[in-house]
């Protein structure tokens, strides 16, 4: 064997990835001596790993190794945690990999993972550490210590510590509950079962001797766990009724090993050529470093002899004990080097190299949804040398070494090699040859994936725990604090400064007075005597800190915790966000950031499973120049909506037509032949005319074309067919791509059913006849090729190559000079399909001769066995045969969006929120989805940033190319990307121009995220309405979120459903996980868990806005009320020589924040509503105040503080004047008893004033709020009467009857609140009348009943039936249970409301509409359709006129479906997208055909100005009418739009729309 590359390399790997523990780790050695790795060393290693990860983000787009380590090579340098590892199986470790005691030097992390922030042991110290990051808590702790010393006048130290203990305890309990769910999921995951080989020796790790420290931790965990389970059980018994009403809050993601039965007959037999299939979308490894012995160079020279030799790892000559068996064990017990057997539907517990599978050809299928969000199956291959391993005894005899690269987070790259010795057949008695086989990502099963459609797979563990790729992408669960909470520290510091000033004044004044007179004033002295003025002032200072401590209110933090907890409960209880299908409410997992949800400016969303259902449906096709299929897509609905058509009515009519067409199509198929696999409900390709052509009613030529097309769909794929028993039976297809499954399913429905694979071929039932088609070769799809091909021998002996792929790619490979008419017609049809938002593919074929195929196959086999540049060689060979194709036709597939996605995106856009899509899917798919969900539209220019790997060879060249593209695109906006522009961008919260969208791929993103280009890229994105980042890794997603969050200083929200979204969910200010059947890690790491994307609108626009406004108002009122109370005490010091005497009886001070004033302000924070939920959704522009952070500002804070000081003056001096002027006052002042009476005079009006002030600032005066105000005011009277009636009140005894019988007291009770609140009332009235906010106008309209229609629609939505799956798309634009609003446009909602009662939106709201610049009457200004009620009445949509010209709707009476309705939009699409290789254009495809070359890689869009853009045909207007621009509106005024008709510009004739 070759020597290892470096000693101790694994040790650095372990150090770089392990977390710091509370104690050092013990390494047990043979002699019993202990080696310890110090905590400082571990922390240093951890910091080094963090720095490397951060640097990797800018280099690779993901926290990967440095870019100078080439893919495919295994570096031998030991640079900390980046050293490779070598694993030995049934071979002794070489001496250089052992320590002096004979134990392995390499150390690997355990497979036990923890996403929870706390453990039972670390909870208390760690939680206290986080809580005392709050500066107020530190201050209160200091006060508690200060009160202990009697010289400072502390009354009761124990009582003073109660508030701090309460807030610390309440917060700790809340944090414990939040973290408990993560802990439970961690426990379930770590204890999930796996079949692990036991009874053999794994030499790569030493025996795990549990140390005393770990035993202690385990004992504590079991102890605290048992206590918690007891509490939980008791709580569940008490909460049985609540549990029956609401489903369990635990995500439906429990870890269970699936034990679905496996039918071996369903196993796919893959042809031998699939041994070298490369399924990953990354290029092949580059040539390895010659100094690194990853493979044997001798084997390369004998490639001709060894290319057909199958390796065998089993050494039958070595003796074995026979005790090895596969037994169930927990995930956490797996270690590197273990043999594991994975069964069908099992989740992968670690990163595993596949040695053998149940398939004789070594293929297995995995679902990677947890990693990249894709539910389609991917093929993984076992190593050729390990396929003979079947049983435990085979594993005992297997001798080999695995050389692996170090752990790195790139999900699409892996490089390693397996080495063993074997005798060759031509020299059976000679020495065993050293053999080697490369290991790639297609041989690796990653943790978090699921094994599908494979009976079992056997492999060895190469990475565990935090070394696995999924965990390296997950990051560490952050501790998030709300933005207001962070900003609150500044205000607390300000109040602390005011407190210090007050204390200094008191100390100086008391010291000076004491030095002058050495005697007290006539009033009572409370302070301590220091003996000298300086010492007296020093004591007075600290005594004043204690007395004035309420200026920094600890009660505020307690109240905020209560408010946030109740807000979280109401969010959880909102049935409008309850997803009944999976029994999933909205679960707040981080209770302390609900107000952050009300300030979100950027939302980052995953695509697959988040925006879409990832359910592909075959909708349309074009075959031999004839279009087929009927459908109504989201994109069509969006176009109709822009044209002013009532989408709901249009969709209803078209649905009826499609339903009738489906009945006719099914009847025709049944008449053609009895297809037992046709299920009516599964049929998505609705084309009666296709059925007629298939039956030959329109001639044999088209019949042959349709048959051959469907046969091509049934043969060109890599799907796995499963037959489900039933009557009739059902064929289910599992594929690498859901598109592929949709194509094969449609072929099945049309009578070409794939039955499975056997004997190296595909079995197909063709129109009732079973046929076998031998598969000679499969050329797999990847993102660079954008196509896949299958070479099949037909029954007549011909060899045909079927190729399907992107239309631009196929057109560039068609045979020159043929099918000119068909190519042109097909291009037009594909363009129409693309306008409808469908994903298009082209199907082509080529006939091969025997000699041609044999020659190509020889070259292919040589390329497939190459050890270097294998992918490049395979692509080069494939390129030679995928040429001179004959076009068969094209397909159009719809990726179904989740319910309500377009409306939710539209609402969020109206609110001023920018939505970016970060997806691991390919660019073409993301663009199609962008059109479907209204992120993109035909009026946009797509800015494409694309740097290809083949464009350069060095990092500097890549950076230069990326910089040039950024500079070119920034020039469109007259920008350079400098610091001044960034400063302006940080202050600008307006919506960007709606005419630009940006698309970028992951490889380009790697370079634009570098430090030198990041700022320019950010500023370019800021100018675009939509941004789509495609083919991005999880770490790149997090890097993009971090760039926007920190670069623009905005609030961000990330939403996703898979493990690949965890990093960005944790990076964003607010993380939202979508719960489903998979992706529990996203829910585990999120702050909120919801069931569907559409619930985001209610979470953000309703609860988020409410929470932010409530918290802002609560904090302001808290500071205000404590200012009154504290400054009243301060004013009293002026009359008692600043001796820091309490003017209030001490129980008043305790009761003030506990009972007198806290309940109303807490209810304000929990229940106050400026507008209802339905109005919040009907007018989403109200949310903009949160984006601009106008609810909580420093100006507001200081105004409330000044108001509090003013009212403290009134509250103190008015009662003081009344008391001094009464006969009860002594001639020389007040004695001790009179101090308490004056305090009562001041306290009662102050409490009434404070509660009245809170009521004034409250929008919603419901019975509970009014009751809390009344009870709070009454309670001070009640307490005073009860307490002073007892002798426990001491000097306050009998104060109530003495005070309450005085007329002056009742006069103070009336005059003081009136004078205090009068300025506030006057200012508020003036503001509402003369300078109303948007919400003030909307509230007036709501009070008038203008939103009654929206309220009724919300009630109907909550009580109405849920949308049925599979219902037509057009109907869904207005559906979705619990959406809380009607899904019509905001004016259409009130079509039945009288003209004078329809909502009139304020100008600021209209200005902030990102989709249309609407005036106060709803009239559209720029490039938008007018949808107000008046304009609907002025220009009603005339269906008859619309059908005449230029558009014709599909009719079921026509033999062929009409595409005229779609063709109207083609001319608007072509100027912006003609040069795009992601958007089909007939003109573009024609140029591709003529030049026979591939498309370019950049978008060069120059928008053309033509009359069609402003034609009435697209807006539901007369052809002679034109839209006015904003300048015309401003010039003529809004009154011009009230006329019945709008004339064209004088002197300019109307232009006809382009045809």
Curated annotation (Swiss-Prot):
It is an enzyme of class 7 (translocase). Component of a flippase complex consisting of DNF1 and CDC50. Interacts with CDC50; the interaction is direct. Mg(2+) binds at residues 606, 608, 1057, 1061. It comes from Chaetomium thermophilum (strain DSM 1495 / CBS 144.50 / IMI 039719) (Thermochaetoides thermophila). Residues 1-85, 257-288, 1364-1456, 1489-1555 are annotated as: Disordered. Gene3D superfamilies: Calcium-transporting ATPase, cytoplasmic domain N (3.40.1110.10), Calcium-transporting ATPase, cytoplasmic transduction domain A (2.70.150.10), HAD superfamily/HAD-like (3.40.50.1000). ATP binds at residues 606-608, 740, 781, 783, 786, 804, 839-840, 919-921, 1031, 1037, 1060-1061. It is a multi-pass membrane protein. The record marks 554 as: Involved in the release of the transported lipid into the cytosolic leaflet. The active site is at residue 606. The keyword Metal-binding applies. This is Phospholipid-transporting ATPase DNF1. It catalyses: ATP + H2O + phospholipidSide 1 = ADP + phosphate + phospholipidSide 2; a 1,2-diacyl-sn-glycero-3-phosphoethanolamine(out) + ATP + H2O = a 1,2-diacyl-sn-glycero-3-phosphoethanolamine(in) + ADP + phosphate + H(+); a 1,2-diacyl-sn-glycero-3-phosphocholine(out) + ATP + H2O = a 1,2-diacyl-sn-glycero-3-phosphocholine(in) + ADP + phosphate + H(+); a beta-D-glucosyl-(1<->1')-N-acylsphing-4-enine(out) + ATP + H2O = a beta-D-glucosyl-(1<->1')-N-acylsphing-4-enine(in) + ADP + phosphate + H(+). One of its GO terms (molecular function) is phosphatidylcholine floppase activity. The chain crosses the membrane at residues 135-155, 157-177, 492-512, 538-558, 1124-1144, 1147-1167, 1201-1221, 1238-1258, 1263-1283, 1303-1323. Residues 1406-1432 have a biased composition (Polar residues). Residues 72-82 have a biased composition (Low complexity). Residues 156, 513-537, 1145-1146, 1222-1237, 1284-1302 are extracellular. A 1,2-diacyl-sn-glycero-3-phospho-L-serine binds at residue 1320. Keywords: ATP-binding, Cell membrane, Endosome, Golgi apparatus, Lipid transport, Magnesium, Membrane, Metal-binding, Nucleotide-binding, Translocase, Transmembrane, Transmembrane helix, Transport.
